[in-house]
């Protein structure tokens, strides 16, 4: 994580690709994988440009379609510049009015700058806002600012004890 934190301020998809090429090259050396430069670049290219690598939660489109009728939706994501293309490829980008991406700040959740940026962009007060995530650590960051946190425990790794409201499916947001 230290490597990513030191090298996460990335503005373009090409910078992202180069960053992952360096990252995979370093990992190859560290783990003695003996990957060739060509193999490293193939892996980095696939990670950056292959939109088939990404999936959404089951029922995400249905839930987003319903929620956008009554609520302004935003996204705060620990991610890279290719996220915009990824969200469009999976058909969910247009549900979000605002977006805050960690790569634009060189910081990861739960850094408060990400939550504050999203609040500023949407013109909402923290008390009027809900933040859904699968990480308790990220929820704590939102809660410290007065944002209502909800844990989505859609997979076993995120189904942990939580002081926050917990859902197991996005469909639960519609109830």
Regions found by a protein language model. Name each.
Residues 1-58:
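N-terminal helical cap/lid subdomain that shapes the substrate entry/recognition surface
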Residues 10-11, 49-51, 70, 102, ...:
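Short, contiguous strand/loop micro-motifs
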Residues 34-38, 65, 79-175:
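Asp-based, Mg2+/Mn2+-dependent phosphohydrolase catalytic module
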Residues 75:
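Phosphate-binding loop of NTP-binding sites
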């Amino acid at each position: 994580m230290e490597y990513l934190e030191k090298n996460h301020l990335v503005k373009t998809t090409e910078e992202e690709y180069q960053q992952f090429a360096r990252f995979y090259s370093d990992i190859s050396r560290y783990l003695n994988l003996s990957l060739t430069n060509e193999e490293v670049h193939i892996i980095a290219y696939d990670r950056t440009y292959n939109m088939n690598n990404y999936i959404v939660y089951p029922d995400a489109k249905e839930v987003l379609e319903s929620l956008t009728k009554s609520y302004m939706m935003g996204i705060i994501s620990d991610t890279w510049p290719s996220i915009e293309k990824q969200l469009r490829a999976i058909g969910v980008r247009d549900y979000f009015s605002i977006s805050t991406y960690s790569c634009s700040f060189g910081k990861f959740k739960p850094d408060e700058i990400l939550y504050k940026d999203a609040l500023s962009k949407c013109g909402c007060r923290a008390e009027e806002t809900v933040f859904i995530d699968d990480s308790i650590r990220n929820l704590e960051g939102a809660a410290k600012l007065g944002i209502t946190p909800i844990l989505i425990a859609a997979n076993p790794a995120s189904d942990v004890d939580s002081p926050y409201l917990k859902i197991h499916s996005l469909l639960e947001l519609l109830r």
